Each structure stands twice: as structure tokens, then as C-alpha cells.
């Protein structure tokens, strides 16, 4: 099994490289790529950690050597948010970066499972899909927007608020990966009893948690460490699925289009990537209304990505 990280010298990428070196199964190959010349050094640095994961680093304009033979590709390349920016402000720069990298994936490892971390995920996943489609290699079972951080934050905040064991707290998060499109299904959390006045503030905190980090870092970055852990968890789940285990994660994929062309919901992962898209289950009145309210934003985000490629 080979996992490639594109954008491995960045704030998310370096932390992700460390976590994957520690957490991937023994015998996995880990390829680290970034345009920055420091990248082979990042690979040497993490290669000194004593685990049976083989690491190689690549830098320069062309990610092809890192992508050759890859089963899983994680894309975290791009610019990060700064105070006053929202994820859509990143679009102008990151859209072109994702397009260029996915064009290389389409040629070098078209059958790989691709996890998009680069924001705005609602839009960059649509860009990736259209690039792969133009190349004639699009398989919707193998393209994912990594929304796992919304799940991690939900689990953390719910466990803190309700005094639950965080390792046993599970919160499905549906929709997209920015602002109002992030919808934690708090009504489905086991062992949590909610007062009416708790739901909306907690939902808003989860939706705006990225901004909480950006502001707290005072211009010094965005959520890189927690995002890296989220991406590592998702990568491990993908690798388990590809190895024949049954794993369920919430992720942003192309499904039946009931709500939007791309939509985050629980997905059973397996040998072909998406094995089954699971139902979102019963919603509270608050959640049903929030779902309906988010859809125009989500549709517009997706359309932006489609138009970026198709004009």
C-alpha cells in the first residue's frame, strides 16, 4: 500500500507526515511531495522515527515520482486562511493548485483514492471531479472531501459539554465543510440529553471552529495540527477499507444528488473506496431546517468549482 501526501511541507502536511509515519500499518510506503525544496528533508526527518513505514520525499514542479503506484493520495497543498478571510477567499489561489495536481493524478495514478483537504473543500472537490472526468478517469467511489475535522471537533465539544468519554462519543456531521454547510447531528448522539438552548450555540461553535483557531493564532496560521490528525484518521480508515476491513466515516462524496451533487454523510469504505453511502437518519426539527437553509450555499459552492473547469 502506498500513500502520497501532496503539500507535505506545509503546516498541515508536515504534521500529517509525522502522524502517518506513526500510524500507518507496517510495510506502507509514504511519499511526501511539495514544491518547496525542504520536502526531501521533511522525509529524512520523519524517517528517523522507528516505525515500519517507508518514507521518501520529492520536491520541485512535478509530483509524478511521488504519485507513481499510489493507492491513496491526500492533497493539502495551497494557502491557509488568515484572520478576516473565509474559506471561499482561498478559492482564487487554491483552485488552480488543486487542478494542476489532479491533472497529474489523472495521468499517473488514476485508480487511486483521492482525499481533498485543500480549502474550500465544497468547491475543490467539484474541481477535482471535473478534471478527472475530462481525463476520462473519474470514479466517484474514489474521490473524497476530507471533512473529518468537523467530526473531531463535534466529538470534542459534545464530550466536554456533556461530560462524556470522548473516545466513545460519535457525532455524525453532514453537508459540506464550511460555515452553515457544516451540520452536526447532535440529536443522534448516544447518551446526550439536550436542552433547547444548547443546540444552536454548539452547532454554531462547530461551524465556526476554524475561525476560532485562525483568530486565536493571531495571524500566525490556521487549524493545522487538528486538521492533520483528522486527515490521518481519514487516511487510516481509507487504508483499512482498501485492505478489506469495514469502516464508516463521514466524508464529502458524490452520491445520489438528493441534497446536492456532493454531500458529506456517513460512508462505508471498502476495497473500491466508497462501498455504500449510508442514510443520514432521523433529523430533529432544528437539523431539518438547518439542512434546508444550507443547500443554496452548498449548491453555489459546487457550481463555482464546476464552472472553474468547464467555463
Curated annotation (Swiss-Prot):
PROSITE patterns assigned to the protein according to its UniProt record, in alphabetical order: MDH
Give GO terms for biological process: malate metabolic process; tricarboxylic acid cycle
| Catalysis: reaction(s) | (S)-malate + NAD(+) = oxaloacetate + NADH + H(+)
**Active-site residues from the entry:** 177 (proton acceptor)
An example Gene Ontology molecular-function term: L-malate dehydrogenase (NAD+) activity
Keyword NAD found: yes
A Pfam family hit: Ldh_1_N
Query: What Enzyme Commission number(s) appear in the record?
Result: 1.1.1.37
Keywords tagged on the record: NAD, Oxidoreductase, Tricarboxylic acid cycle
* Gene3D superfamilies reported for this sequence: Lactate dehydrogenase/glycoside hydrolase, family 4, C-terminal (3.90.110.10), NAD(P)-binding Rossmann-like Domain (3.40.50.720)
Classification via CDD domains? MDH_glyoxysomal_mitochondrial (cd01337)
Enumerate the residues binding NAD(+): 7-13, 34, 94, 117-119, 227
Tell me the InterPro entries matching this sequence: L-lactate/malate_DH, Lactate/malate_DH_C, Lactate/malate_DH_N, Lactate_DH/Glyco_Ohase_4_C, Malate_DH_AS, Malate_DH_type1, Malate_DH_type1_bac, NAD(P)-bd_dom_sf
> At which positions is substrate bound?
81, 87, 119, 153
Q: How does it assemble?
A: Homodimer.
What exactly does this protein do? Catalyzes the reversible oxidation of malate to oxaloacetate.
**What's the family?**
Belongs to the LDH/MDH superfamily. MDH type 1 family.
Q: What is this protein called?
A: Malate dehydrogenase
Q: Which gene encodes it?
A: mdh
Amino acid at each position: 500500500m502506498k500513500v502520497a501526501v501532496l503539500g507535505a511541507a506545509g503546516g498541515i502536511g508536515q504534521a500529517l507526515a509525522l502522524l502517518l509515519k506513526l500510524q500507518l500499518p507496517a510495510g506502507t510506503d509514504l511519499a511526501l511531495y511539495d514544491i518547496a525544496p525542504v520536502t526531501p528533508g521533511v522525509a529524512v526527518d520523519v524517517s528517523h522515527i522507528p516505525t515500519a513505514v517507508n518514507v521518501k520525499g520529492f520536491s520541485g514542479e512535478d509530483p509524478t515520482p511521488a504519485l507513481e503506484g499510489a493507492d491513496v493520495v491526500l492533497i493539502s497543498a495551497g494557502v491557509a486562511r488568515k484572520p478576516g478571510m473565509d474559506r471561499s477567499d482561498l478559492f482564487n489561489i487554491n483552485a488552480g493548485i488543486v487542478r494542476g495536481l489532479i491533472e497529474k493524478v489523472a495521468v499517473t495514478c488514476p485508480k487511486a483514492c483521492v482525499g481533498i483537504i485543500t480549502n474550500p473543500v465544497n468547491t475543490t472537490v467539484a474541481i477535482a471531479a471535473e478534471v478527472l472526468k475530462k481525463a476520462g478517469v473519474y470514479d466517484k467511489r474514489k474521490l473524497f472531501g476530507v471533512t473529518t475535522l468537523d467530526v473531531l471537533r463535534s466529538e470534542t465539544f459534545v464530550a466536554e459539554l456533556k461530560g462524556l468519554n470522548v473516545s466513545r462519543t460519535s457525532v455524525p456531521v453532514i453537508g459540506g465543510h464550511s460555515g452553515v454547510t457544516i451540520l452536526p447531528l447532535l440529536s443522534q448522539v448516544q447518551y446526550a440529553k439536550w436542552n433547547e438552548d444548547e443546540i444552536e450555540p454548539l452547532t454554531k461553535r462547530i461551524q465556526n471552529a476554524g475561525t476560532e483557531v485562525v483568530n486565536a493564532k493571531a495571524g500566525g496560521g490556521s487549524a493545522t495540527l487538528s486538521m492533520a490528525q483528522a486527515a490521518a484518521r481519514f487516511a487510516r480508515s481509507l487504508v483499512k477499507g482498501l485492505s478489506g476491513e469495514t469502516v464508516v466515516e463521514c466524508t464529502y462524496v458524490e452520491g445520489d444528488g438528493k441534497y446536492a451533487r456532493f454531500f458529506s454523510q456517513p460512508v462505508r469504505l471498502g476495497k473500491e473506496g466508497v462501498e455504500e453511502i449510508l442514510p443520514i437518519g432521523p433529523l430533529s426539527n432544528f437539523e431539518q431546517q438547518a439542512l434546508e437553509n444550507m443547500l443554496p450555499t452548498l449548491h453555489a459552492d459546487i457550481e463555482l468549482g464546476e464552472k472553474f473547469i468547464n467555463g
